[in-house]
Amino acid sequence: MKQISDGVFYCGLHDKTRKVFDQLVPLPQGTTYNSYLVKGSQKCALIDTMYVKFADKYMAMLSAENVKIDYIVSNHAEPDHSGLIPTLLEKFPEAKVYCSPKCAENLKNMLGVADEKMHVVADGEELSLGDKTLKFIHTPWVHWPDTMFTQILEDNILFTCDFFGAHYTANELWADCSPELALSAKRYYAEIMMPFAKFCAKYLAKVKEISPKFILPSHGPIYDESGVAFIENLYAEWTSENVAKKVILGYVSMYDNTTLMVNYLENALVSRGIEVVKTDIMETDEGELAMELIDSAGIVFGTSMVLTGPHPKSIYVAYLANILRPKLKFSAIIGSFGWGGNLTAPIDAMFTLTKPKKLENVIAKGRPKPEDFQKLDALADAILAEF
């Protein structure tokens, strides 16, 4: 346990061995699960708890502190933050869980927390711990509908749960504001927060209005005065409507026919002053692709035909590009087939939430021929016209 300020302590844990989050998101550095203890002059509160995998270590840490927990604040019901609430309620049977209405519903359904053990807070409600006052601020959809922030009014410390988080396991508790941290925060935003970018922008404005001294998220390092500006500026950039003069060219090729088309289009776009992020989607992890989607204007899928449709990996990438809801303005499909099937419809069908403009696809039969390369030049011109 580490002291953050007078009466405020960090009781989180590192999980450097975890390689994947939600069985989807790669974790190059593992992650942290941040929990906080607030000691008032009369009462004590935990702000979020711990992933159940670390139950023994977490409970031993609290026992060593010899503290009685009066309140458990659940900013968000996802099990990596709420998992030990039942265990804590057994150890501290008089404690109450303070949470949003939707969080109470989730805690009941997912963890079996009884209604009488929870107090549902109104937006703006306050709770006195004596010389410290907690204020609860409803912030749904960053990134679950149950999310809220908690503020210590006297210290102006803001607990933002997953908002401003990072899967970053540096040894230092305080953010170093390094390029490495910025990259981890960007990966986290892209994979988890980008589908809710409009809500992120809304609550970023709320945070700036509060102007907290410290920001304490539920993953990654915590932010002091300089760190607050660092993470706020990054989120302001990512949540803006701005896109770069950049195109993602994600491809998979079985016998290099599609590769020939991809390389030709890449050169055609670069010669027109367009940045191209070319990536073999059989090798690129989802996090890297998600980060590029934050500010890319368009995406071009390069795919081979597998039986009667596009390569399954292309469909998967299209699915991700849809559910992450990036600011894509346009998309196109290029590729090669042998004798029949439909290379484009299954990819186009993935875009139900994100609605990029569909540019003219270029599909070659077998090895691309001169007329196919001419069509790729026309596609490059069409892409340039979108800027």
What is each residue range found by the language model?
Residues 84, 284-289:
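Short acidic active-site motifs
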Residues 216-243:
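Short N-terminal or domain-adjacent regulatory/targeting segments
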Residues 3-6, 99-147, 199-204:
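Metallo-beta-lactamase
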Residues 170-173, 180-215, 219-222, 264-277, ...:
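FMN-binding flavodoxin-like domain, especially the glycine-rich phosphate-binding loop
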Residues 50-98:
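Active-site metal-binding motif and surrounding structural segment of the metallo-beta-lactamase
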Residues 143, 147, 163-194, 238-243:
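Active-site-proximal loop/helix segment associated with metal-binding centers of metalloenzymes
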Residues 250-272:
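Short, charged N-terminal beta->alpha structural module
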Residues 2-64, 149-152, 156-160, 258:
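Conserved beta-strand hairpin/beta-sheet module of binuclear metal-dependent hydrolase folds
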